[in-house]
Amino acid sequence: MLVERKVKHSKTMKIMRIFLLLLSLCFITGSLNAQILTGIIYDRENQESVPGAYVYIEGSSLFDITNEEGKFEIKVNTTVNASLVVSHIGYNSTTVLDPFTSLPDTIFIEEKAFSLGEIVVQAGRYSRKQLIKAFCNEFLGTSSAANSCVIENEDNIHIWFNSRTNTLITECDEPIIILNRYLGFRLYINLEKFEVEYPGRQLGVGLPLIYFKSSIFFNDIDPINRRIAERRKSVFEGSRPFFLRALANNQLEKSGYWLSDNFNKNVSKIHECFTVTDSLDFKKVIVNQELRSQNRATFYGIPYWSKLGITRDDNENSEIILFTDTFYIDSWGQLSQPDDLAFTGYMGSLRFGDQLPLNYGIESSRSFSQ
C-alpha cells in the first residue's frame, strides 16, 4: 500500500513538472515574439536630450512620449513591416526604416528650417474656405467618419492653388491634428507633401491625381465605447488591411469576398487566383499563372500583371491591380512593398477619415489625455 502511494505521488509530481515546463515554455514563446523598442532622442546640434518628442510605429496606435532624459519605450508583440518615426514641433521628423533589426540606441533629430517654396496663386480666385474644403474632400474623404472629423489646428495649415499647374498644395510646419469623433481617435499626421492635381482648370472638378507623403499615429480617445467599437469594426471590414489579412490567412471566402474579372458573374475561386505560403514574418502570395496577362496593360503608364474585381457587398466594389507576380503581407495586413498593389473603386476611395490604426484588432492601443 505504501509502495502504491509512493508510485502515485511520483506520477503526480512528474505530471506537475511537465505542466510547469509547458507553462514556462508558453511564457517564453510569448516573450520571444514581443519586442520592446527603446532609445534616447538627442538634438544633433547641441547634443542635449529632447523631452516631449512623439516616437511611434508608423500608421499605428503604438507610441511613446520621451521623458525628461529623452528616453522612450514601445512594446510591439510581433515583427511587422513598419518604420519608427520621431516627431517634435520645431524639428524635422526622423524615420528609422527597420526598427526591429537596426534600431540605434541614440537617435539624433535636427531643427527645422522654416521656409515656404515659391507660391503661384491666382489672386482672388478661391477663398481659403474653398481651398480647405477641397483639401478635406481629398485628404479626409466624404464618408460619415470623414464628415465627423475636425482639424484642430486648421489655422496652421498653409494652402494655395498653383494656377499654372492646376494643383492644390498643402503644407504644415507641425503635425496636423484631426479629431475623428465617429471612430474615437485623434490622429497626428506629419504631412511632408500633399498635392492634388486637377485635370481641368477648376478646383474640385474631375478625377485628380494625388501625390502625398506622410506619417501618422493614432491616440485612442474612447477605447471602451461600445457604439464606437461597432463603428470601428464596420469600417475595418471594408478596408484594405482587412482584405489583405484575409488573403494572407486564406480566408477571403470566409470573409465574404468574391473575386472576378471586370466584375462579371464568373467569380474566381480564391485558390485559383493565389497561392499563399509562410515566409518568416510574412505570408508569401503568388499570383497563379492563369491570371498573369501575356500582353501586360498599363495603369497610369505602369505595366501590371493582372487586375481583379473585388466584391464584398453591393456597396463595396473595388479593383486590385497587381504590379508583381509575388508579394508579401505581414500580420497587420501590410505589404512589404506598398507599390506591389493598387486599389481602385471603394477601397481606393478611402482616405484618412476612414483609417484605423494598422495594429487594430491585434495590438492594444495606447492613449493619453490632450
Regions found by a protein language model. Name each.
Residues 37, 44-59:
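Short, ordered, surface-exposed loop/turn motifs in non-cytosolic proteins
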Residues 61-71:
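Short, acidic Ser/Thr/Gly-rich low-complexity loop/linker segments typical of extracellular
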Residues 37-43, 70-72, 107, 118-119:
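A short, amphipathic beta-strand motif
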Residues 53-57, 84, 121:
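Hydrophobic beta-strand segments
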Residues 57, 85-96:
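A short, solvent-exposed loop/turn motif at the edges and junctions
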Residues 1-40:
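Bacterial Sec-dependent N-terminal signal peptides
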Residues 50-51, 74-81, 357, 368:
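Short Pro-Gly-centered beta-turn/loop motif in secreted/extracellular proteins
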Residues 105-370:
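Surface-exposed, low-complexity/disordered segments
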